[in-house]
Amino acid sequence: MHDMRNTARLVGVCSLVGGAAWTAACFVHNSLPQGCIDAECDGHAMRGSSPVATTLFVVAGLMLAGAGVGLLLLARERNGGLGRAAVAAGVCGALGLLLLGSAAVVSAVDNDWNGMPGLVVPGVLLLAAGLVLLAVAVIRARVVPVWCSALLLASALVLPFANEQTSRILLAVPFGVCWALLGVVVLRRPAAVQREAHAGAGTM
């Protein structure tokens, strides 16, 4: 019981910090000169990154990864085990974060590397797929209110349309806001999350 409450609180803190860092990173990144997409890059420099934006995105990635793992643990307690959606969410999310992390490292070394889309595009798609599956697993387990999971799901579906080269990076802002909101919800009701998880496990 005590461990589940601690897990819920950890999820809340990671979600809130990660969501806030992600949102701030999007605005900081958008303050940089506009980049280019595909054919527009002929004679036009791609948008790089800044140390502040990169640091914020790294913090956000680590915090949200921790929050995602915590949510899966709560869902496992709720359902008495991890379903296929939860396992697939973990795999897709991990691969997506690995690719995006690699892109961040490469960007710090060479902002104009032509192969960047090969890391960013599949990374974003895998991350979005993992988040959709995570939202499905959380909705099924009712770890948090359904409306909160639904907002996270909707923001994940918008994520692939964001692009770090233009102001379309702001399409990723709702994703960070929804994670921060989820963190607030969990922190305000960690005991309730714990009770729901154990109640669900008891009915399996």
Give the label of every model feature segment.
Residues H2-M204:
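Hydrophobic, aromatic-enriched alpha-helical segments typical of multi-pass transmembrane helices
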